[in-house]
Structures are given as C-alpha cells and as structure tokens.
Amino acid sequence: MTKTKQEIYNKRPTSPHLSIYKLQISSTLSILHRMTGVALFFAVSILAWWLILSKYDNNYLQFANCCIIKICLVAVSYAWFYHLCNGIRHLFWDIGYGFSIKAVNITGWCVVVCSILLTMLLWV
C-alpha cells in the first residue's frame, strides 16, 4: 500500500506548543508595528493623492467632513503615534536598554497607553 504525500502530511502530529501558545505583549506589539508601518505607507500615499486632487477641485475638501473619513483619520493618527512610540522603544533597545522581561512588558504597555493619549490629545 502506497500512501500519497497528502495523506502522510494530514496524519502528521502537530507540535503541542502550537495549540497552547499564547501571544505575549512583545510579539503582539511587534506584529502591530509592522502592520502600522505598511498601513501608514498606504495612508500617506492616499493622503498625498487626496491633497493634490483637492488643489484642483474643492469638492475633495468637502469630502473630509464625512464621518467615515474622520474615523479613518483618527485611526491613521493612532497608527502614526503607535508607530512613533514603538519606534522610540526600539531605539532604546538599539542602545541596549530595556531588555529584561519586566521592562519589555512595562514599555510595551506604555507604548499602547501613550499612543492612545497622544491620539486623544490630537483629536479632542
């Protein structure tokens, strides 16, 4: 009897750590840092395109009063502040500070709280 590769692959056991792994704050923030970097690239590109178009047609400026656009701008500003704060955290890591588990957790939560506060200060 010959088993196909797919049958053998389907019957292979999964490593137990994959089923019980819990994301840590540092891994979550690392993933979010990369995601916000990509999102900011596209957001700045769209914003530049919108500003160029608004120079030629004032209807694009009126589009900014839309509620959905304001929500998107708040989200982009949060992503920017988060990316900024986490980038500062990475700069401290680059010079060798904050590598203990306690420091990583504290600075991670500080990044989240500071980015929320800075976004609120900008929009309130």
Swiss-Prot record:
Chief localization: membrane
Cellular component, GO annotation: plasma membrane
Periplasmic topological intervals: 56-67
Localisation: Cell inner membrane
Alphabetic keyword roster: Cell inner membrane, Cell membrane, Electron transport, Heme, Iron, Membrane, Metal-binding, Transmembrane, Transmembrane helix, Transport, Tricarboxylic acid cycle
SUPFAM superfamilies: Fumarate reductase respiratory complex transmembrane subunits (SSF81343)
Cytoplasmic topological segments: 1-29, 89-103
Example of a GO biological process term: tricarboxylic acid cycle
The protein's required cofactors: heme
Domain of life of the organism encoding this protein: Bacteria
Coiled coil: none
Membrane topology of this protein: Multi-pass membrane protein
Statement: the UniProt record of this protein carries the keyword Transcription regulation: no
Pathway assigned to this chain's UniProt record: Carbohydrate metabolism; tricarboxylic acid cycle
Record's subunit section: Part of an enzyme complex containing four subunits: a flavoprotein, an iron-sulfur protein, plus two membrane-anchoring proteins, SdhC and SdhD. The complex can form homotrimers.
UniProt record similarity statement: Belongs to the cytochrome b560 family.
Protein name stated in the entry: Succinate dehydrogenase cytochrome b556 subunit
Organism, scientific name: Rickettsia felis (strain ATCC VR-1525 / URRWXCal2)
Lineage, opening ranks: Bacteria, Pseudomonadati, Pseudomonadota, Alphaproteobacteria, Rickettsiales
Gene (UniProt): sdhC
